[in-house]
Structures are given as structure tokens and as C-alpha cells.
Design a protein with these regions (language model features):
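A conserved ligand/cofactor-binding region detector
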Residues: 2-174
Length: 174
């Protein structure tokens, strides 16, 4: 009869000892030239598009990924600061969020609106065209979803340690 105790699998050799320093990277630059190069990288290598692609959706996606990488740096630094200070956090759960479009707000919060405008101009694109290509990120159908979005946006503006949670659903509305 086999032994009834369950032995955990052995940890991989890479997980033993000190943690590998894979996240120690220089901060991403916010200047126009760096934004342009990262945009081109995401457009060509991540999305697999070339100069013949005229679909604004892919251009919007490349810009969103470029900005997301910069937001992730700030997000990780914020989490580390809250964790090291043992800050209490609030968690907000809602069945719906009507966040709306976020591109222009993200550009403003990162302080890269002018740099992005210049980078896109150098690539033959207009920021306004990409802003119009952004899909609406609404999840829900009413006032409570808008209230939830406003609450989280206010918390972010005030730099409060709040996370929002929701249900992701694919078919229909609540």
C-alpha cells in the first residue's frame, strides 16, 4: 500500500538560495525619443505589425503597451513602498465599473502628453486619432458602475492605498 503522506515537490534549483535579481532594471525614460522607440518595438515585435498596417486599433495597442510599461514601474514602486511601511489598505468590490476611456488621463498622469504627441508626429500619426480608437472600458450599465469608477479615480488621485475588484463577465449585462 502506498504511503498516504503527500510529499511536496522539490523546489527547482533556481528557487533555492537568494532570489535572482531579475527586476533590477533602469527606469524607462519618458522623453519623446524613448517613447517612440518603445512604441516601434511593441508595434513590430509584440503585435507583429509592419509599416503597411494602417489599422488604428494596432497603433492604439502599441501606444497603450508603451504607456503600460511605464505605469507598471510606478505601480511596483508604490506597492513596495506601501508594503515596507506596513500601510493598511482598503479593498473595494463592485459588480460593475464604468471607467470610460483612460488614454488621455494616463498621458496626463505620466506627464508625457507632449512627448507622446511629438513621438507620434515623427511616426506620421496623430494622438487624437489614437485617442478616438480607444475602446470604452465600461463594465456594467448604470450609475453604480460610474460611482465605483469615480471612487477609485478619487482614491488614486489622493494616493490612497485602495484596490478595486470586480467580476469579469463575457455575456450580457447584470
Amino acid at each position: 500500500m502506498p504511503d498516504s503522506t503527500i510529499n511536496p515537490p522539490q523546489a527547482s534549483r533556481i528557487l533555492q538560495g537568494p532570489a535572482p535579481d531579475i527586476n533590477n532594471l533602469p527606469d524607462l525614460a519618458m522623453d519623446s525619443e524613448s517613447l517612440k522607440e518603445d512604441y516601434r518595438h511593441y508595434f513590430a515585435h509584440y503585435l507583429g505589425r509592419d509599416h503597411n498596417c494602417r489599422n488604428l486599433h494596432y497603433h492604439y495597442e502599441a501606444l497603450a503597451l508603451t504607456l503600460r510599461a511605464r505605469l507598471m514601474e510606478r505601480w511596483k514602486n508604490t506597492i513596495a513602498a506601501y508594503d515596507s511601511a506596513r500601510t493598511r489598505k482598503a479593498h473595494y468590490m463592485s459588480l460593475e465599473f464604468l471607467m470610460g476611456r483612460a488614454l488621455s488621463n494616463t498621458l496626463l498622469n505620466l506627464g508625457v502628453t507632449d512627448g507622446t504627441t511629438h513621438a507620434l508626429h515623427d511616426l506620421g500619426l496623430l494622438l487624437e486619432d489614437l485617442e478616438s480608437a480607444e475602446p470604452d472600458a465600461g463594465l456594467g450599465n448604470g450609475g453604480l458602475g460610474r460611482l465605483a469608477a469615480c471612487f477609485l479615480d478619487s482614491c488614486a488621485t489622493l494616493a490612497l492605498p485602495v484596490k478595486g475588484y470586480g467580476l469579469r463577465y463575457e455575456y450580457g449585462m447584470f
